[in-house]
Amino acid sequence: MESLNALLQGMGLMHLGAGQAIMLLVSLLLLWLAIAKKFEPLLLLPIGFGGLLSNIPEAGMALTALESLLAHHDAGQLAVIAAKLNCAPDVHAIKEALALALPSVQGQMENLAVDMGYTPGVLALFYKVAIGSGVAPLVIFMGVGAMTDFGPLLANPRTLLLGAAAQFGIFATVLGALTLNYFGLISFTLPQAAAIGIIGGADGPTAIYLSGKLAPELLGAIAVAAYSYMALVPLIQPPIMKALTSETERKIRMVQLRTVSKREKILFPVVLLMLVALLLPDAAPLLGMFCFGNLMRESGVVERLSDTVQNGLINIVTIFLGLSVGAKLVADKFLQPQTLGILLLGVIAFGIGTAAGVLMAKLLNLCSKNKINPLIGSAGVSAVPMAARVSNKVGLESDPQNFLLMHAMGPNVAGVIGSAIAAGVMLKYVLAM
């Protein structure tokens, strides 16, 4: 009987909590959205599966060595950790002390847990290498750069303003998060508000990179919100676009884009990086990888490297990035009031970014002979190329012969640049406070 009881107690099912059960259902929902609805499947599928692995009771796949020690509840070991932190020897007090401790002290406690025989789970290791170091989002950005054509942007430089205007959603969302905190509705610190705001850029890698730096505790919710809303762009944007434009404006036919020379395409990423990085060094990592990837594409002399970055490398990193995000979908971190606030602010951010891009296009039309179809302003959010396709689709509904796709790619690419710069601004000024 004792052996049978020990066997039963060793089953994960016996230790399944309500929070873990809910998160298992959330993870299954993400898998269903990825497989059945094809909502950003390249990221939501590994994120969902990572969420499943993270919430299997007793497996500890997403726990660091220190978290495994705390979950083990050994009184002697807790006393050693508590003595180092000068707090009461119980799990809750230790967690509070760790939250207030310096990163160097947290690292010392992690090493102490390793010395006591605990090891981090595989997903925790993935997270440390892929996101904790910031490497995975940067490599993804390199791949995106290698797949990006700056031609439409260079052919119509005014569209850069549309991409810039769409970033207004980012900063409006930061203010929204701080407003919720001010009125005591949902508690958000300034770094957390900045990390949430980047959802408005509709740029998954940038959202993961920034939240990993500013608010790693919210990374799971921010990543899920960012990629879910990116997949919902065809549903979120059209009503806003139609509400802000007239039938006549939607029928505007734009002048055919000029041919951009190879020299321009080669010089642009180099000049862009130098201008932005010299003014805002904190944007250099993201923008640097993006421009490097694009230079490999446009130079034409490293086709093997360009092909590897666009295909094999970005696919491999995407797998580990998704599983690493899934490591943050543990119940005690995800099932918080903050998650609801993130989901609400995320959709508002998308809406504001879309509206700002459309309104900027209308403003430019007031002082220009060559009219811009305001619909392409919505492509200023950097969901590439989905936002551009939505602009084209809504335009075709008003005029079946008015193809806006290539025109919309200009602000779409500008949005990627804008979100990277916005992330640099957040890092520079938020971390300095």
Swiss-Prot record:
Keywords: Cell membrane, Ion transport, Membrane, Sodium, Sodium transport, Translocase, Transmembrane, Transmembrane helix, Transport. It is a multi-pass membrane protein. Its main location: membrane. It catalyses: oxaloacetate + 2 Na(+)(in) + H(+) = pyruvate + 2 Na(+)(out) + CO2. InterPro entries: OadB_MmdB (IPR005661). Its EC number is 7.2.4.2. GO terms for cellular component: plasma membrane. One of its GO terms (molecular function) is lyase activity. It is an enzyme of class 7 (translocase). Catalyzes the decarboxylation of oxaloacetate coupled to Na(+) translocation. Heterotrimer of an alpha, a beta and a gamma subunit. NCBIfam families: Na_pump_decarbB, PRK15475.1, PRK15476.1, PRK15477.1. Belongs to the GcdB/MmdB/OadB family. This is Oxaloacetate decarboxylase beta chain 1. It comes from Salmonella typhimurium (strain LT2 / SGSC1412 / ATCC 700720).
